[in-house]
Each structure stands twice: as structure tokens, then as C-alpha cells.
């Protein structure tokens, strides 16, 4: 009863008599006296039981406990530090100091003073009572593995090293910089909080030491504080610059090649150009210069990972000035970090000036191509481009090839343009390629209306109007040109297009196209077809793959492992050409037999049809789309010959010949006679019939997987988590990945969380 009084007295206990209450109070008083006598022994027993209980969380192995703690947020981890010494030891040594985020210049100053004071983690929970749970004190600067600088500033650095400065003490500063006056206010606020705090955690000596160190670094600029922090963290492997503004710049004064010599300062003050890769082709380097440069290069600090994430908030607001608002990559952005092994760029624009090679400011590898010929290469071995724009033209691909010769791992994430796949051929040492298949350039392709495939009629002359007005006296609507002017999006045409029987540039080919003025792209999906695929939850990547198939086939594949990420396989399966043509041949045969039995039952149908939703007025709509199922029917008198029909027939003939040689069932099949006796125009060109285009995603998936089979190894990461993926057995995965497994390529499939769903041939 006494423990329930912590929540207050309830009005429902008023029914108990006062005498009974007094008796209960006397009993509770005796119990309290007894509990005071045994308090010490009770604490010891409870403490021993707490740590000896095998069912408690603390008895879990350290690896398991770390996995559990890794799922918690930062605030929860800070709260758990006060539970006991083991939690404090694990959290401080494994989580709190591993990934540091600094969001202001004041936070940089505080953290810089903290690590220079040789701060050690200590046990907050005093006298835990068990030697096995005592915290191990470690130096905080040795625990930091990653550090992030949010919204880095460069105005104070530009002001410090500019010849214009504030002489009169005014707030306006020349040279495009501004004065940071919020520092003193932040310091006063922090001091007030520190003085008013009733439970100080650190001692007064520690506070005095931190204040002294802060005063020593008070006049440092933002970039100087950043570099000083990086230099004082020996185990640092990752540096992140996030929310970088487009006007952010790092002056060349902070280059790692700045040795304090007068020659280096003269180059910057006079604006002298550094030696570049182009200069090495015209000038001869002395052996002394090469030896001195190599000694400087190999003595530079090394950084494993550098990430630069541009701030894209302004880009969404000012769409008209999007190109000017985006952060443009310049060599000065990473000239102060030393030799970088892995570079990750996000929302950054890359142009020809981004790949400049100033070897006297930027650490570049000087490679001896020949006895007297040298070339400059970036030391980066892993490159990640996330939502980056590559400005085309001016030999950008050639510069990529010469600049990133040492890159072995390339990752293209959230690709903005499908033509960025051409960059994959610009890395001579490439061995591992990662492509994001859920990028907008693969899922948001252009779709057209059905009128795209027909010749538009214009009613310009009076005779046309008279003819159309006279049509109202009959039961027929105005006739429209039902001839298709470009290869339509049917399964047969898309398959012939993917197998190179039809060229995507046939619009300009006089030999294949009788009307070369027609520059329309073939097999463009219509809006109705895309809606049909979306209702079936078919991924857009497989629906549009024939749009960019040529770009995927141009990817380098020799001795290269590919990692395909964010790709779904919902409601699709690989349909091989032989299976498709075999099914189509059976369908054509069954349709012909049915037509012979039906006879003349459909004589009452009209020869010309229109869409049901077309407007039927006295003056017909010139953009009305013909109903191809009626126009291309065997009873129709309208027959058109298309230049792509022969290409589709050749694709069908070659597949039937292969099928005849492989299958006993079709050995007696006369291929030429079969092609002459059947009518194929309806199956080839009627893109309005769902039966004629339903297999486009399945055909595209087969071509996509067949293209992946050319690589050394294939790794696939699904778009969704395991619980949201289509449940498949190992046999189902083998059927899905059959085009890849036929060539014995090692393949591995994981879900979004990294759980292995299928593996074959992996070591």
C-alpha cells in the first residue's frame, strides 16, 4: 500500500474506516523500522541478484548488446549512460564519440578545446560495486572515426587572407565577406547556463582549462578550426561537409603544399597558374623537381573518405536559376585534406574546370608513362556520384579518363541523366561498378499519346469540309489515315528492337525507312500502356528498359563486377525470344483455326472504327485515333505495308529455325511456308490490344539479365525490405535469374537491409 502512495491518495479509499487506517499505519511503521535495520544487507543482495541474473540484459554478450544499442537514437543512448558503468563504457567508447556532428563555428571551438585538453571518458556512475563493470577510461580524440561539418563557412577565411579588410570597424566588409558577430552572444549564453547549473558534471579545474584553450583558438577561422580538429584526430577515417552552400570556397592558402615558403605565397598573391597535365606534354620536368615533388607527395596526410554534400534547398525554390545555384566542384574544395582514397559527391555539378590538375596546390599522383613523359592522376580509388550533374561537351569524357585513372570502384546513385552511364567507360582501372536502377532517369521516361503513331490530317481546304459535312448524311464518320508511321510499342517490335533487328535510328535511314523525314523514335510507350503496367504493379524500370538498352550494353564488362541496387522484380519474369515466338506461333495457329469455323458471323461489323471516347460532331476531329483492331482485321479492305515488318519477320524466322533445331516437336515445321500462310500484321502493329504489348516488361527483363551475364560477378540489392518483397523459394530465384545462371556467373541477391535472399557461386 505504501508504494502506491507515490501516485497520491485516491478518493475511492474513503470507504475504509479510520480505525482500520490507524492499524495499517502502525503495521507499516514497524515494517519501516525493520527495513532500516536490514537496508545494507538488502542493497547488497539486490545488487548481486541484479548482476547475477542470467535473464537480464546485462548478461548478453558484448557483440549482441552492441547490435541492440546500435538501433537506438542519440538521445536514448545519452540517457542509458546514466544506468550503470557498463552501459556508459559501451556507449561512450562505441557510439557517442565515433560520429561527431558540428553545426556551427562555436561548436567547432568547443570541440577543438575539448580534444586538446586530452579529455578522457570516465565513470559517471560511482561505486558500482563490481570490478567487472568498471569503465575503461579512454582519450576522446582516439575514439572519433567520423566527423561532419554542417553548413561550413568560408567568409572569415576569405576576409583574413584578402587585402581588403575592415579598418573603421564598420559592419560592412569588402571582398564579399561578412562579419560574424554572433559568437560573443553564444559564449554569454553558454556561460550563463554553466553558472546557473546546480549539478555540474565536470570540475572547476576542467572548466578553467577549457576556457583557456577556447581563448587560444578564439581568433581561428572556421576552416582553420576544421583543419586543426582533423589533424588532432589520429583515428579519423571519414570527413563530411554537408549542406555546403554554392558560394563556399577554400582559399589556396590552406593547401597541404603550403610549406610557408615565400615562393608559395608569391604564386597565390600574383595569381600564377600551376603546372597542369597539359603543361607536362609541352615542358620537360627535371629529375630534381620530380624527386622533390614525390617526397612532398608521400609525406602528405591521408584521408580514407571525404564526402561533400551540397545544399539543394535553394535549387528547389529558384527553379529558373537552378544551374547557377548548384555547387560546382573545384579542386580547391579538397586541396586541404591531403591524399583522399574515396570521394563521395552529392548534388554537385562537374564541368571541365572541376577536373583541372594544379599539381602545386592539389595533391596529384605523378606517374611516369614513359622514360621522359609524365602524367598527373587523382589518387582517388573510389568515386561516388549521388544526384550529380555532369556538364556535357568540351571533352569532358576525355578529362574523366585522364583524371580518374586510378578509380577502381564507381557508384552512380540517383542518376539525373541516363547518358551518365557513358562515364563508366572513362575509368581504365574500374573493377567494381554500382548503378542505382531506381533513379528518375530510368523510371520517369517520356510517354506519348496514340496519335503519335499516325499521320495527322488537317482540314485546310473547302473540299475537305464539304466532304466531311456530306459524311453526316451517312452512317459513317469521317475517314482518317490509319497508317502507322513509326514502329509501334508491341511485344514483337520491342523484341526485334532489343535484338538489333530494328534500329532506333531507322527514322533517318533511307534504306530502311521510305520517309526519312520522319524522326520519331520507335516503340515509345503510350500513356494507356503505362497505366496498364502500373495497374499490374509492374516496375517502370522494366517497362522502359528498351529506351536505354543501348546505354546499358555499352557498359564495360570485362573483369568488372556489377552491383545493381534498388531494383524490384514485382510481377515480372524473364521471357526469352524462343519462348515468346513459340507462344505467338501457337496463338496465330489457334486464331486461324477459329476464323475458319466462325465464317461470316461478323459481316455486320463496320470496316472503319474509332475510339469510343472520340467526339462525334458534324465536323470530325482531325486528331481522332483509328481502332487498329478493326482496321487490321482480316475482313478489312485496308492493308498497309510497313518497312519494319520484314525486320520482325526475320527475327521470327531466326527464332523458329533455332526452335526447330532444338525441339523434336518442331522438326517437321516448314518455316517459310508458315510465314507465308499466316497473317502477322495484327500481332506486329496493333499496339492498342493488351495481348500484343503485355510481354514488353518480361522481354526487357530477359534482355537486362542477359546483359548482366557479361560481367565478372553480379550483386543485386532489392528496392524493398524482406517483409515487402515477393516471397520466392530458391527454385523461384533460379527461374528468375536463369539468363544469368546459364553462363555460370557468380550472383548474390540481398534485400534492402542486406539480408541474403539468394546466392550462387559466391566464395
Swiss-Prot record:
GO terms for biological process: protein catabolic process; protein ubiquitination; regulation of sulfur amino acid metabolic process. GO terms for cellular component: cytoplasm; SCF ubiquitin ligase complex. Gene3D superfamilies: 1.20.1280.50. It is found in: Cytoplasm. The keyword Cytoplasm applies. It comes from the Eukaryota. Keywords: Cytoplasm, Phosphoprotein, Ubl conjugation pathway. SUPFAM superfamilies: F-box domain. SMART domains: FBOX. GO terms for molecular function: protein-macromolecule adaptor activity. Substrate recognition component of a SCF (SKP1-CUL1-F-box protein) E3 ubiquitin-protein ligase complex which mediates the ubiquitination and subsequent proteasomal degradation of target proteins. Probably recognizes and binds to phosphorylated target proteins. Regulates protein levels of sulfur metabolism enzymes. The SCF(SKP2) complex may regulate some transcription factors or regulators of cysteine and methionine biosynthesis. Present with 432 molecules/cell in log phase SD medium. Interacts with SKP1. Component of the probable SCF(SKP2) complex containing CDC53, SKP1, RBX1 and SKP2. May interact with ribosomes. This is F-box protein SKP2. It comes from Saccharomyces cerevisiae (strain ATCC 204508 / S288c).
Amino acid at each position: 500500500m505504501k508504494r502506491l502512495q507515490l501516485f497520491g491518495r485516491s478518493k475511492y479509499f474513503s470507504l475504509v474506516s479510520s480505525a482500520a487506517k490507524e492499524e495499517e499505519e502502525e503495521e507499516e511503521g514497524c515494517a519501516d523500522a525493520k527495513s532500516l535495520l536490514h537496508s545494507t544487507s538488502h542493497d547488497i543482495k539486490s545488487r548481486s541478484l541484479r548482476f547475477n541474473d542470467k535473464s537480464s540484459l546485462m548478461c548478453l554478450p558484448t557483440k549482441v548488446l552492441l547490435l541492440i544499442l546500435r538501433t537506438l537514437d542519440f538521445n536514448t543512448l545519452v540517457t542509458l549512460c546514466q544506468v550503470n558503468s557498463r552501459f556508459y563504457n559501451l556507449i561512450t567508447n562505441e557510439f557517442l564519440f565515433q560520429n561527431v556532428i558540428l553545426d556551427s563555428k562555436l561548436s567547432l571551438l568547443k570541440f577543438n578545446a575539448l580534444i586538446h585538453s586530452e579529455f578522457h571518458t570516465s565513470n559517471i556512475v560511482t561505486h558500482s560495486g563490481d570490478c567487472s563493470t568498471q569503465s575503461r577510461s579512454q582519450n576522446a580524440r582516439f575514439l572519433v572515426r567520423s566527423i561532419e561539418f554542417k553548413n561550413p563557412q568560408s567568409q572569415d577565411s576569405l576576409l583574413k587572407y584578402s587585402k581588403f579588410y575592415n579598418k573603421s570597424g564598420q559592419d560592412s566588409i569588402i571582398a564579399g565577406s561578412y562579419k560574424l558577430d554572433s559568437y560573443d552572444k553564444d559564449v554569454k549564453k553558454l556561460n550563463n547556463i554553466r553558472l546557473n547549473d546546480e549539478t555540474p558534471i565536470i570540475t572547476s579545474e576542467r572548466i578553467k582549462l577549457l576556457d583557456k584553450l577556447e581563448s587560444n583558438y578564439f581568433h581561428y577561422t572556421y576552416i582553420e578550426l576544421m583543419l586543426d580538429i582533423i589533424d588532432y584526430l589520429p583515428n579519423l577515417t571519414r570527413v563530411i561537409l554537408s549542406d555546403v552552400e554554392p558560394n563556399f570556397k577554400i582559399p589556396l592558402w590552406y593547401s597541404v603544399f603550403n610549406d610557408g615558403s615565400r615562393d608559395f605565397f608569391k604564386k597565390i598573391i600574383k595569381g600564377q597558374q600551376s603546372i597542369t597535365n597539359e603543361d607536362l606534354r609541352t615542358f620537360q620536368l627535371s629529375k630534381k623537381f620530380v624527386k622533390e615533388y614525390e617526397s612532398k607527395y608521400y609525406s602528405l596526410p591521408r584521408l580514407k573518405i571525404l564526402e561533400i554534400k551540397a545544399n539543394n534547398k535553394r535549387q528547389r525554390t529558384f527553379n529558373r536559376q537552378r544551374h547557377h545555384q548548384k555547387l560546382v566542384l573545384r579542386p580547391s574544395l579538397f586541396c586541404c585534406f591531403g591524399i583522399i582514397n574515396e570521394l563521395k559527391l552529392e548534388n554537385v555539378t562537374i564541368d571541365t574546370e572541376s577536373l583541372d590538375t594544379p599539381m602545386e596546390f592539389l595533391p596529384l599522383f605523378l606517374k611516369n608513362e614513359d622514360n621522359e613523359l609524365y602524367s598527373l592522376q587523382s589518387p582517388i580509388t573510389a568515386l561516388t556520384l549521388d544526384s550529380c550533374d555532369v556538364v556535357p561537351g568540351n571533352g569532358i569524357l576525355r578529362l574523366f579518363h585522364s583524371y580518374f585513372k586510378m578509380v577502381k570502384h564507381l557508384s552512380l546513385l540517383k542518376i539525373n541523366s541516363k547518358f551518365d552511364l557513358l562515364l563508366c567507360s572513362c575509368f581504365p582501372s574500374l573493377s567494381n561498378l554500382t548503378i542505382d536502377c531506381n533513379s528518375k532517369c530510368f523510371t520517369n521516361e517520356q510517354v506519348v499519346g496514340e496519335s503519335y503513331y499516325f499521320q495527322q490530317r488537317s482540314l485546310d481546304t473547302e473540299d475537305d469540309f464539304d466532304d466531311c459535312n456530306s459524311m453526316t448524311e451517312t452512317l459513317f464518320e469521317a475517314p482518317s489515315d490509319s497508317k502507322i508511321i513509326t514502329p509501334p510499342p508491341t511485344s514483337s517490335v520491342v523484341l526485334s528492337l532489343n535484338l538489333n533487328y530494328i534500329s532506333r535510328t531507322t527514322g533517318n535511314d533511307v534504306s530502311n525507312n521510305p520517309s526519312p523525314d520522319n524522326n520519331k523514335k520507335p516503340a515509345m510507350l503510350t500513356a494507356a500502356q503505362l497505366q496498364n503496367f502500373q495497374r499490374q504493379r509492374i516496375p517502370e524500370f522494366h517497362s522502359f528498359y528498351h529506351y536505354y538498352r543501348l546505354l546499358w550494353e555499352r557498359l564495360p564488362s570485362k573483369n568488372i563486377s556489377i552491383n545493381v541496387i534498388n531494383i524490384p522484380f514485382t510481377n515480372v519474369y524473364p521471357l526469352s525470344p524462343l519462348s515468346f515466338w513459340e507462344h505467338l506461333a501457337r496463338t496465330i495457329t489457334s486464331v486461324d483455326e477459329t476464323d475458319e469455323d466462325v465464317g461470316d458471323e461478323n459481316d455486320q461489323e463496320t470496316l472503319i472504327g474509332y475510339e469510343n471516347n472520340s467526339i462525334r460532331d458534324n465536323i470530325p476531329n482531325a486528331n481522332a485515333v483509328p481502332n487498329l483492331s478493326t482496321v487490321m482485321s482480316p475482313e478489312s479492305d485496308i492493308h498497309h505495308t510497313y518497312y519494319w515488318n520484314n525486320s520482325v519477320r526475320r527475327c521470327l524466322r531466326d527464332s523458329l529455325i533455332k526452335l526447330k533445331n532444338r525441339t523434336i516437336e518442331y522438326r517437321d515445321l516448314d518455316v517459310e511456308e508458315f510465314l507465308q500462310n499466316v497473317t502477322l500484321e495484327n500481332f506486329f502493329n496493333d499496339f492498342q490490344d493488351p495481348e500484343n504489348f503485355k510481354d514488353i516488361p518480361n522481354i526487357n527483363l530477359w534482355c537486362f539479365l542477359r546483359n548482366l551475364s557479361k560481367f565478372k560477378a553480379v550483386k543485386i540489392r532489392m528496392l524493398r525490405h524482406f517483409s515487402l518483397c515477393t516471397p520466392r523459394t530458391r527454385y523461384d530465384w533460379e527461374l528468375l535469374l536463369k539468363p544469368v545462371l546459364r553462363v555460370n556467373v557468380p550472383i548474390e541477391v540481398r534485400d534492402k537491409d542486406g539480408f541474403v535472399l539468394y546466392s550462387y557461386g559466391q566464395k
